[in-house]
Amino acid sequence: MPYIFAFFCTGFLGAVVGANFPNNIQIGGLFPNQQSQEHAAFRFALSQLTEPPKLLPQIDIVNISDSFEMTYRFCSQFSKGVYAIFGFYERRTVNMLTSFCGALHVCFITPSFPVDTSNQFVLQLRPELQEALISIIDHYKWQTFVYIYDADRGLSVLQRVLDTAAEKNWQVTAVNILTTTEEGYRMLFQDLEKKKERLVVVDCESERLNAILGQIVKLEKNGIGYHYILANLGFMDIDLNKFKESGANVTGFQLVNYTDTIPARIMQQWRTSDSRDHTRVDWKRPKYTSALTYDGVKVMAEAFQSLRRQRIDISRRGNAGDCLANPAVPWGQGIDIQRALQQVRFEGLTGNVQFNEKGRRTNYTLHVIEMKHDGIRKIGYWNEDDKFVPAATDAQAGGDNSSVQNRTYIVTTILEDPYVMLKKNANQFEGNDRYEGYCVELAAEIAKHVGYSYRLEIVSDGKYGARDPDTKAWNGMVGELVYGRADVAVAPLTITLVREEVIDFSKPFMSLGISIMIKKPQKSKPGVFSFLDPLAYEIWMCIVFAYIGVSVVLFLVSRFSPYEWHSEEFEEGRDQTTSDQSNEFGIFNSLWFSLGAFMQQGCDISPRSLSGRIVGGVWWFFTLIIISSYTANLAAFLTVERMVSPIESAEDLAKQTEIAYGTLEAGSTKEFFRRSKIAVFEKMWTYMKSAEPSVFVRTTEEGMIRVRKSKGKYAYLLESTMNEYIEQRKPCDTMKVGGNLDSKGYGIATPKGSALRNPVNLAVLKLNEQGLLDKLKNKWWYDKGECGSGGGDSKDKTSALSLSNVAGVFYILIGGLGLAMLVALIEFCYKSRSESKRMKGFCLIPQQSINEAIRTSTLPRNSGAGASGGGGSGENGRVVSQDFPKSMQSIPCMSHSSGMPLGATGL
């Protein structure tokens, strides 16, 4: 039974995990003609996809100008559970489509003409032409011209031209040719000829444009003196042979550069697929709308692959819902798909493919082509940053050799010392010259090696880049790259997995790790007995016990060993026949010997026996090692001011609650703790996310200020490089403690699929090999440091000895001298009292005993006096004289019998 249950659970979990992201993605397609080149390009692009998930098309052929039919087909595909719809629209159906997409949260990817809409669920593949057209008109200095347009494309381009005309005093004649017949064309150009209007802008789709040009040729309005600007992105798709022969000047725009590597490779695959799949389609050269269709399929593929890598669940469960329900029920996963589509960036058939937050193309390049009687040539290019760049300037900058050099790139960065800082006199400079710092110089070196021009822009929200867990949107510099507002990020941007899924990184230009910043603790004042610090308290206790133990062992060994006993030398005149044995190592002498040896001073006595000398030898060896070790450490402990840090590691932070700690609110450090599976870091993350007040800060500067003002009650977790830099800045009151918690690196970021990735990567490697990266770090970290050499790196500072360092030694000296005086006084008092008691007892001896003693003392001494009891031996065999002390001779003793002093007897 347990095995069955385990098998069931395993199968269930597998089903759930597998359902998180489908292997097959249904996508819709709305095409006006099954035999169109766009339809063939759609199929061809699907056949080129190899990475999962697999895109399965649901294609409907529809009249794109019929609102009812478009509504029916759109709702039909939505009910089938498609994840996104690719298709075309016209002026009559565009509003209906955008309304449905916004209400149902279904993404619609289209190569049709751009429309001005705030609906973020409509992704417009075709670049806008308004600004490019105005730049070309301005380049030719046209003041009076005719604007022929097709109302089916909308009026956005015309409106922008008329607004500019009002600003620049242009004379513009606008003509709508939506319903113009052949006779109408004839009358139109006859009227223009009368007014001598020979400068004409034609704004039409390719099919209608070919018809208009045919009428121009038929009416012979294509001779010398006529100049036509074609507001169309497919200049090479149009047959202009008649114009070339007659001498008219024709200028236009070309979106697809067929000589580039990627279009050339795809074109080769395009041609080889002709004979197998789509024999009735002209494959000589795809139209720009077909190229947009191909890129549109790749946009969807890239988006779903990104969602799959990020493990975002977009599975459609149950019924897809009613398209015409009132109110409309939006699809829950639609917003995730919409964000993924907008974040896509790659080099496709139409160049750099990326979108802004409104779903419109951005950072694209249009090639400006001109045809005269001598042939077709490229006269320049246009992009959003540089506007129109003539071919001469293009050639000076390197021509068409590299697409990297064709525009000014936006380099996003963040104000963070010492990476990017405003100069003190920044208001006196413009552009990139306003900034200084490590990353400013690095960006300049990268641009010099790659060979492109750039403009530094500070990220508006002041964040590095993190993904909002609710909206799934990216902020900071990562968001700038993801949403196409910047081309490169040169900043202290950490390389992480979640960021690598949406942007590309170069090789690391700096290695680092997460570290702990705390307020530098006050230097501990040396204690009175700091000379005891070289040895631990336990060692001092062991030394005391060893001293006592050695003294006791020496005393016992000396008592037991017969070789420690010896005869005392007698005074001259004494009887030397008596041999009394003595031992110099009593308990006090043993203590004195051990103390003298420990102090390396010695004493007047030494062991005589082998056992005693063994005890003395091992004690001398012990004291030699202890004293040498103590002396070696004493200098360092007395001359170094030490700082006691309350925190030394992440473990210390995790196991206490008195000191708060936090990270940057949006950054890789916070993401590291959130994703970590290490017990210590999980515990720290649990504390940080639930701490009140919040321990997270918006900027590194805010974290630094909080550390300084919290009086040691807040620790800030940040990258080690920034920690080391702040430690070198005044007021020099922060410090880095412990080692790094992880190992990672800073990298230069580019959008996914950017052409800059490889050149930038090679430039970083070259700068590293040249040693320039190390030079830059030394320059901005240490050469410009404000805390002195090593001032911020060392927790200890060597200085001269002061009285406070050795005060304890003087205290012990003074105490010892005082103790000696006190003991001497006690000894004197004790001896005086003892003598007084002894003399008092002597004076009370009976008169007869005194007389007898006197008589005895007058007798001549003989050799047997000592043996007969007239003398005695004292301690250690010394003979005690029986004569009265001199002091006693002057003491008046009273006789018991007569009451007279002894001195009065005349004795």
Swiss-Prot record:
Q: Which residues lie within the membrane without crossing it?
A: 585-600, 601-603
Q: Where is the composition biased (Gly residues)?
A: 866-875
Give residues annotated as binding L-glutamate.
P492, T494, R499, S668, T669, E719
Summarize the activity regulation: Glutamate-gated receptor activity inhibited by DNQX (6,7-dinitroquinoxaline-2,3-dione).
The subcellular location is:
Cell membrane; Endoplasmic reticulum membrane; Postsynaptic cell membrane; Postsynaptic density membrane
Expressing tissues: Detected in cerebellum (at protein level).
Here the disulfide bonds are C75-C323, C732-C787
PTM summary from the entry reads:
Phosphorylated at Ser-645. Phosphorylated at Ser-710 by PKC. Phosphorylated at Ser-849 by PKC, PKA and CAMK2. Phosphorylated at Ser-863 by PKC, PKA and PRKG2. Phosphorylation of Ser-863 is reduced by induction of long-term depression and increased by induction of long-term potentiation. Palmitoylated. Depalmitoylated by CPT1C and upon L-glutamate stimulation. ZDHHC3/GODZ specifically palmitoylates Cys-603, which leads to Golgi retention and decreased cell surface expression. In contrast, Cys-829 palmitoylation does not affect cell surface expression but regulates stimulation-dependent endocytosis.
Topology in membrane: Multi-pass membrane protein
From the UniProt entry, list the residue stretches annotated as the region Disordered.
857-881
Show where the record puts the motif PDZ-binding. 904-907
Q: Does the keyword Membrane apply?
A: yes
- Domain notes per entry: The M4 transmembrane segment mediates tetramerization and is required for cell surface expression.
Relate the assembly described in the record.
Homotetramer or heterotetramer of pore-forming glutamate receptor subunits; heteromeric assembly can be the result of both receptor subtype and flip-flop forms and according the composition, one partner can be dominant with respect to the fast desensitizing current component, whereas the other can determine the steady-state component. Tetramers may be formed by the dimerization of dimers. Found in a complex with GRIA2, GRIA3, GRIA4, CNIH2, CNIH3, CACNG2, CACNG3, CACNG4, CACNG5, CACNG7 and CACNG8. Interacts with HIP1 and RASGRF2. Interacts with SYNDIG1 and GRIA2.
Q: What else is known?
A: The postsynaptic actions of L-glutamate are mediated by a variety of receptors that are named according to their selective agonists. This receptor binds AMPA (quisqualate) > L-glutamate > kainate.
What name has this protein been given in UniProt? Glutamate receptor 1
- Per the UniProt entry, what species is this protein from, by scientific name? Rattus norvegicus (Rat)
